């Protein structure tokens, strides 16, 4: 899916159907809104039942979460939160990747992601590794929706704290700083994390050193990368980062793009369904759902009109308050 103008031109080229970009935008917004509501209803059903009805194979899985920024017209930059789930195997990359996303708060994201979590059997899965950065809202999501998961701090994220501490201590671009960083990065990945924390502790005190030391110490159980790799666990969250590039930013973060929130949310919903390879099954629900919603709105308007209508009614056809109506 691309910009509405070129998309309208492609539609005419391949099908002969002429449609203005404004009409295509309106229809896309309507479809996206409907798809989002369908997914919300499914998430509500998962919340009620605690899972999905069909059996889901209990295979090793990775779950990663991250955010990227989308520019909204009236709200400025807002974070689009994305969940990526994939099956782990002996070979990389992950297989059967699927996603869930929203522009809402962390709580709203948790509610809307329940559907995909249920489809993939995450609440009942026995072997889930979650690789993320250390953001509190992400850890809260895992606490609530996948407490049994093995937690790994994204290695590149952890190494970034070491790089910042090295720059603050040795100066930017210095050979000493580069050598210290390379050595500690290697030790963090292949050796003992306690040695890395000790190396940080002996650096001269600075805000960057203290931040790195406190951050990694608080996540000590999530940085045992040598042990994780020995178990065959992933230590990077590239699946969700590439998901942001392909699913979210590939459409919503172009040059000069600013979005109305409903349009952005609708596009995200459509792109998620497409990326999850459920376009055909979901689209089959869109038409019936839109017709049902239209009937419900029509019935509601009819009820309102009847409630507002005067209680007086003519006794027979053709009679009004002013006398008989004669079509002369």
Describe each region flagged by the PLM:
Residues 1-328:
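Catalytic center-proximal scaffold of phosphoryl-transfer enzymes
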């Amino acid at each position: 899916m691309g910009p509405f103008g070129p998309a309208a031109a492609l539609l005419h080229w391949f099908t002969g159907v002429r449609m203005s970009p404004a009409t295509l935008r309106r229809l896309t917004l309507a479809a996206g809104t409907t798809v989002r509501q369908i997914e919300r209803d499914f998430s509500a059903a998962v919340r009620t039942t605690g899972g999905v009805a069909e059996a889901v194979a209990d295979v090793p899985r990775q779950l990663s979460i991250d955010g990227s920024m989308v520019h909204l017209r009236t709200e400025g930059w807002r974070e689009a939160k994305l969940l990526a789930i994939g099956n782990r195997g002996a070979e990389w990359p992950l297989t059967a990747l699927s996603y869930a996303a929203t522009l809402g708060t962390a709580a709203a994201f948790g509610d809307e992601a329940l559907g995909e979590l249920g489809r993939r059997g995450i609440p009942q899965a026995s072997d889930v590794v979650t690789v993320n950065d250390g953001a509190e809202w992400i850890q809260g999501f895992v606490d609530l929706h996948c407490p049994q998961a093995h937690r790994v701090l994204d290695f590149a994220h952890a190494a970034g704290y070491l790089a910042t501490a090295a720059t603050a201590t040795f100066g930017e671009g210095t050979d000493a700083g580069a050598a210290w960083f390379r050595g500690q990065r290697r030790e963090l990945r292949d050796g003992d994390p306690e040695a890395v924390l000790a190396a940080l502790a002996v650096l001269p005190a600075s805000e960057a050193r203290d931040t790195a030391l406190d951050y990694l110490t608080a996540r000590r159980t999530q940085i045992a990368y040598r042990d994780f790799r020995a178990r065959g666990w992933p230590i990077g969250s590239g699946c969700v980062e590439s998901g942001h590039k392909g699913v979210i930013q590939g459409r919503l973060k172009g040059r000069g793009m600013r979005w109305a929130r409903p349009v952005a949310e609708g596009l995200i919903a459509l792109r998620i369904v497409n990326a999850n390879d459920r376009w055909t099954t979901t689209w089959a629900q869109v038409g019936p759902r839109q017709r049902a919603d239209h009937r419900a709105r029509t019935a509601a308007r009819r009820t309102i009109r009847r409630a507002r209508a005067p209680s007086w009614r003519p006794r027979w056809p053709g009679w009004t308050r002013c006398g008989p109506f004669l079509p002369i």
